[in-house]
């Protein structure tokens, strides 16, 4: 399964090295070298945070408080150059799940991440807070991405995604071709409404599990899964 992991590490070389190792496992990695940049991405939550305690503009303890305030259940691994018992205890008190001291082998971190993800999520990662589950798919509305049941991204065009959102947010509602033209293409479109049929056809081909019903002589609607 494809997990999303946020890495906060201010040492550029180590950041790049760990990112490469983590991505080699098939995980989606977003890395930061500053705490302030990580703050901007706290919502929606990833499946896992990896936090360096010592950062140039803040510290991992401050960040984990903010992270846990937004999502108490998201797991966190601390990494630090300090190997002090007080750091480990404080990290646990603040909600971290694991702690690894520098220097360490990247493979050790990978093993810890694997075990923690298995422990927290069992088989598959949960639907993120900005994601919508529809049929066997997960739709990340903010990121404008769609994932199949194996966590693989389904590449949709902008209008395919707009049509998908229209159907998702109005399940069971019948839309005429003219309605869809207006909502997806806008008032400035001039042309045949048959482009709607082509758009629906492409969406069905890419997402065959969607329950999009044809209303003959009128338009379309998406039925509940």
UniProtKB/Swiss-Prot annotation:
Which InterPro entries did the record assign? CheY-like_superfamily (IPR011006), OmpR/PhoB-type_DNA-bd (IPR001867), Sig_transdc_resp-reg_C-effctor (IPR016032), Sig_transdc_resp-reg_receiver (IPR001789), WalR-like (IPR039420), WH-like_DNA-bd_sf (IPR036388)
A GO biological process of this protein is:
regulation of DNA-templated transcription
> Which residues get modified to 4-aspartylphosphate?
52
Q: Which UniProt keywords apply?
A: Cytoplasm, DNA-binding, Phosphoprotein, Transcription, Transcription regulation, Two-component regulatory system
Q: Name one GO cellular component term.
A: protein-DNA complex
Its annotated compartments are: Cytoplasm
Q: What protein name does the entry list?
A: Transcriptional regulatory protein CssR
Source organism: Bacillus subtilis (strain 168)
